[in-house]
Curated annotation (Swiss-Prot):
One of its GO terms (molecular function) is structural constituent of ribosome. PROSITE patterns: RIBOSOMAL_L21E (PS01171). SUPFAM superfamilies: Translation proteins SH3-like domain. It comes from the Archaea. One of its GO terms (cellular component) is ribosome. This is Large ribosomal subunit protein eL21. InterPro entries: Ribosomal_eL21, Ribosomal_eL21_arc, Ribosomal_eL21_CS, Ribosomal_eL21_sf, Translation_prot_SH3-like_sf. GO terms for biological process: translation. Belongs to the eukaryotic ribosomal protein eL21 family. Keywords: Ribonucleoprotein, Ribosomal protein. Transmembrane segments: none annotated.
Amino acid sequence: MVARSKGYRSKTRKLLEKKVREKGAIPKLSLLMHDYSQGEYVVVKINPSIHKGMPHRRYHGKVGLVVGKRGKAYEVKVNIGDKERVLIVRPEHLIPFNGIQKR
């Protein structure tokens, strides 16, 4: 028997799936051009068609705080359990958070 591969995108068959009408489309320019400022809340929403600057699947759907900018990417602080992680994510995988964030 051959050992099962455990790659970076393993177990993402349904998680990184696009709807039929979204396939082949590039993200909205308004989302790509959006300039996030420090202290702004964002949602990590992975775009599976763009591999560059993609975070791990563990962080998909998490709400984080923009800490800074590194090149074209943003540093986003996300809480996983009782630990804080700082992710380096490109804007293709971020959307603005419009809800209420409780701390």
